[in-house]
UniProtKB/Swiss-Prot annotation:
Needed cofactors: K(+)
Pfam family, one: Aldedh
Name of this chain's protein: Betaine aldehyde dehydrogenase
MF annotations from Gene Ontology: betaine-aldehyde dehydrogenase (NAD+) activity; metal ion binding
Listed InterPro entries: Ald_DH/histidinol_DH (IPR016161), Ald_DH_C (IPR016163), Ald_DH_CS_CYS (IPR016160), Ald_DH_CS_GLU (IPR029510), Ald_DH_N (IPR016162), Aldehyde_DH_dom (IPR015590), BADH (IPR011264)
Binding positions for NAD(+) per the UniProt entry: 150-152, 176-179, 230-233, 254, 286, 387
Residues the entry annotates as binding K(+) 1: 26-27, 93, 180
Catalytic activity: betaine aldehyde + NAD(+) + H2O = glycine betaine + NADH + 2 H(+)
Protein purpose: Involved in the biosynthesis of the osmoprotectant glycine betaine. Catalyzes the irreversible oxidation of betaine aldehyde to the corresponding acid.
Length: 490
């Protein structure tokens, strides 16, 4: 693909130049080619976007629930009509295989938007009787202007996960995509405008997170920030949001999630689940189950089943429909993953497979890392303690149920967890003891629109998806009505 035209900001229903004068480049990680130069939003651009959003939000909130619902449903239709072209752009920007982006990224994002479009009329208040002459009623009102700050691994899906409940509740959103993968969020803004969203209700500000993101979290005109990213960055976003104007926050942060295989499990099923929990999207999924616990007596058999499945991984041309494994999202991220792999070797973990970059035709110019499995891992190892966010699986063994529960919970993270077992009683008994916000039994990775997702401990605050997320983008107003004569004590 030839280099795209310089990408601008999207404010008040159209493209506009950044006042900062700064730009950055977005790179195709499959081959190292520059896709586009992108303008970076500065402080003045954030101010412009907030003013635009404030104007648009008043118009949007004044519409009826059904009017808002119809507009969002039109956006869903456009997303589905343009699925393939959006998926191609997402593949170029992220490096993910087209077989994945064309069936997951836009599809699941559109599902979430459709879900919230249908929920808009359900936003209701309540009536509370106090006595014969008095009652209270409540209203759920929008927060106003909110900000979304996205991660680089699911660019358009995250933009939809954040904007769908925010817009459904009557808010306007200013969205800052990751500077690593900024392109499809701009296309989403075009689609929202085409569907009939009032100007200013969805503005997109590409830029560097440490600058543009901080301008958003500092801005007094923004009522809430929804952030997806790493724990360290999330803590800064939360601190800035509180210090500036006591903003509400939703934090979807990192994880080092356990996948526990029990001795009664079907090892073929367990191996299939472990592969999806580690190598889907080249391991760049926040919920990945990278700590795979297997009974000591099953270790050798499980290792062989994993190795057999690694042989089925097909890396290569990301637009080949048979390819199911792409490069990492960027060269700096590739280098960071390789540092973790080197650390694993240094600390004594045994490389079962992989452990290096992929070499050969089609790989040398891209950010490719081989699917890597470490075995003989120990809980104190760096690769077991820290989030790598790449195609790196760590195998650990255990002897008893109590032991594996304790070790699974021995982490600052608490995003996800899963177990594989044929025992229904054990499944529920164990899953109820795992300290994680998203749990799976005999499966892994699905996050449907109806399912609230989010983390325990350092893995986040608040939830995305589900009914409760729609409510989190509203504020409750309570009104007391007195029909009898008011009695003053003065």
């Amino acid at each position: 693909m030839s280099r795209m035209a310089e990408q601008q900001l999207y404010i008040h229903g159209g493209y506009t130049s950044a006042t900062s004068g700064r730009t950055f480049e977005t790179i195709n990680p499959a081959n190292g080619n520059v896709l586009a130069t992108v303008q970076a939003a500065g402080r003045e651009d954030v101010d412009r976007a907030v003013k635009s959003a404030q104007q648009g939000q008043k118009i949007w909130a004044a519409m009826t629930a059904m009017e808002r619902s119809r507009i969002l449903r039109r956006a869903v239709d456009i997303l589905r009509e343009r699925n393939n072209e959006l998926a191609k752009l997402e593949t170029l920007d992220t490096g993910k295989a087209y077989s994945e982006t064309s069936t997951v990224d836009i599809v699941t994002g559109a599902d979430v938007l459709e879900y919230y479009a249908g929920l808009i009329p359900s936003l209701e208040g309540s009536q509370i009787p106090l006595r014969e002459t008095s009652f209270v009623y409540t209203r759920r009102e929008p927060l106003g202007v909110v900000a979304g700050i996205g991660a680089w691994n699911y660019p358009i899906q995250i933009a939809l996960w954040k904007s769908a409940p925010a817009l459904a509740a009557g808010n306007a959103m200013i969205f800052k995509p990751s500077e690593v993968t900024p392109l499809t969020a701009l296309k989403l803004a075009e689609i929202y405008s085409e569907a009939g969203l009032p100007d200013g209700v969805f503005n997109v500000l590409p830029g560097v997170g440490a600058e543009t993101g901080q301008y958003l979290t500092d801005h007094p005109g923004i009522a809430k920030v929804s952030f997806t990213g790493g724990v360290a960055s999330g803590k800064k976003v939360m601190a800035n949001s509180a210090a500036s104007s006591l903003k509400e926050v939703t934090m979807e942060l990192g994880g080092k999630s356990p996948l526990i295989v029990f001795d009664d499990a079907d090892l073929d099923l367990a191996a299939d689940i472990a592969m999806m929990a580690n190598f889907f999207s080249s391991g760049q999924v926040c919920t990945n189950g990278t700590r795979v616990f297997v009974p000591a007596k099953c270790k050798a058999a499980f290792e062989q089943k994993i190795l057999a499945r690694v042989e089925r991984i097909r890396a290569g041309d990301v637009f080949d429909p048979q390819t199911n494994f792409g490069p990492l999202v960027s060269f700096p991220h590739r280098d960071n993953v390789l540092r973790y792999i080197a650390k694993g070797k240094e600390e004594g973990a045994r490389v079962l497979c992989g452990g290096d970059v992929l070499k050969g035709d089609g790989f040398d110019n891209g950010a490719w890392v081989a699917p890597t499995v470490f075995t003989d891992c120990r809980d104190e190892m760096t690769i077991v303690r820290e989030e790598i966010f790449g195609p790196v699986m760590s195998l650990l063994t255990y002897e008893s149920e109590d032991e594996v529960i304790r070790r699974a919970n021995d982490t600052d993270y608490g995003l996800a967890a899963g177990i594989v077992t044929a025992d229904l009683n054990r499944a529920h008994r164990v899953i109820h003891q795992l300290e994680a916000g998203i749990c799976w039994i005999n499966t892994w990775g699905e996050s449907p629109a109806e399912m609230p997702v989010g983390g325990y401990k350092h893995s986040g605050i608040g939830r995305e998806n589900g009914v409760m997320t729609l409510q989190s983008y509203t504020q409750v107003k309570s009104i007391q009505v007195e029909m009898a004569k008011f009695q003053s004590i003065f």
